[in-house]
């Protein structure tokens, strides 16, 4: 408590500590320090217990802002051995899944941006600026299987630095624009049977957006925004991160690339760029790391380059004839 809670939260009155402020504190703490998940869980327990006592026992405040607090829904970088993908492995995976357009495009997106799993799976077409060749990373997706109102939710990125722009390399640009064409074609084919999703915004007491529930069209969506989700099944069905489950069983068992995760594409992206002369500050910005130390702890340092060249450097190293063939798409009428 003395090391983390008092220095950051002790300067506020209890009544001034909202759920949003406590959540920001937790995600920033997780981003800054490279401890195991169990360690952060202990900090969270102390925080929740303190506010429960302040509310229920002592009556210092009427509302408990820590009641629904939880750790960020992200992969635990510390507890897993990282896998550094090489070009042969990437080519093998893309060759095996060349007929699975959704997984292939999601894989290439993570491979060429270093985005977190939840950030990739939360992408909407509104986030992708094809004119300026930029991806606007603004949110992440997580599930609440026991919620009963809708499993998948869209929330803010891990930290404020998680909100960022990533320039698309030529390879990624072509992959995404062709995938969008295919999705539009499938919408026409399925017609009224194509599944459409909407965002049901959940607003806090302070009037600020907490998160958005992703719901299927149920006829009661007049005042909701269309989700325009990128990575959906051919019929429009959205399954969040589960889009990756079956392919990775094949990758582990059939292809023999064991102990690798979708998330490891993030580390592979960073390490490949750093080894090829990209400045670590630029890589940290692309990854959404607030502190360079976070990048240094997981990846290999290197020398200077321009931030916008990060995507181009990776493109030159990793793009093969196979990838170029896979991202080509022509609608078959």
Task: Give short role names for the model-derived ranges.
Residues 132, 143-145, 149-163, 170-172, ...:
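C-terminal secondary-structure termini that scaffold catalytic or DNA-interacting sites
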Residues 52-65, 90, 108-141, 281:
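Short, charged phosphate-coordinating catalytic segments
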Residues 15, 61-63, 73-95, 136-138, ...:
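DNA breakage-rejoining catalytic core of tyrosine-based enzymes
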Residues 56, 108, 112-119, 242-243, ...:
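C-terminal catalytic core of tyrosine-transesterase DNA break-rejoin enzymes
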Residues 1-53, 57-59, 79, 237-243, ...:
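N-terminal core-binding DNA-recognition domain of tyrosine site-specific recombinases/integrases
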Residues 169-257:
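Active-site/catalytic core of tyrosine-dependent DNA strand-transfer enzymes
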Residues 127-134, 258, 278-298, 308, ...:
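Short, polar N-cap/turn motifs at the start of nucleic acid-interacting alpha helices
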Residues 76, 84, 141, 287-312:
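Catalytic-site neighborhood detector that most strongly recognizes the C-terminal catalytic loop/helix
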């Amino acid at each position: 408590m003395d090391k983390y809670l008092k220095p950051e939260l002790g300067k506020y009155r209890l009544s001034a500590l909202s759920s949003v402020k406590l959540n920001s504190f937790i995600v920033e703490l997780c981003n800054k320090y490279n401890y195991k998940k169990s360690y952060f869980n202990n900090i969270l327990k102390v925080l929740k217990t303190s506010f429960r006592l302040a509310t229920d026992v002592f009556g210092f405040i009427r509302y408990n802002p820590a009641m629904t607090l939880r750790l960020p829904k992200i992969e635990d970088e510390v507890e897993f051995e990282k896998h550094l993908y090489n070009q042969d492995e990437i080519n093998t995976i893309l060759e095996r899944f060349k007929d699975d357009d959704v997984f292939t495009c999601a894989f290439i997106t993570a491979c060429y941006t270093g985005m977190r799993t939840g950030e990739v799976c939360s992408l909407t077409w509104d986030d992708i600026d094809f004119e300026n060749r930029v991806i606007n990373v603004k949110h992440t997706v997580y599930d609440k299987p026991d919620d009963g109102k809708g499993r998948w939710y869209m929330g803010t990125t891990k930290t404020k630095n998680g909100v960022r722009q990533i320039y698309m390399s030529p390879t990624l640009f072509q992959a995404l624009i062709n995938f969008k064409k295919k999705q539009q074609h499938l919408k026409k084919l399925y017609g009224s049977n194509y599944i459409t999703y909407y965002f049901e915004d959940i607003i806090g007491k302070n009037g600020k957006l907490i998160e958005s529930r992703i719901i299927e069209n149920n006829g009661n969506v007049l005042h909701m925004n269309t989700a325009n989700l990128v990575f959906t099944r051919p019929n429009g069905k959205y399954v969040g991160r589960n889009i990756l489950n079956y392919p990775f069983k094949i990758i582990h068992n059939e292809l023999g690339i064991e102990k690798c995760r979708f998330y490891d594409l993030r580390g592979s992206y960073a390490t490949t760029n750093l080894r090829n002369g990209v400045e670590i500050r630029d890589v940290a910005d692309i990854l959404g790391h607030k502190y360079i130390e976070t990048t240094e702890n997981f990846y290999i340092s290197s020398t200077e380059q321009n931030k916008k060249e990060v995507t181009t450097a990776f493109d030159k190293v990793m793009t093969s004839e196979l990838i170029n063939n896979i991202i080509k798409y022509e609608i078959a009428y």
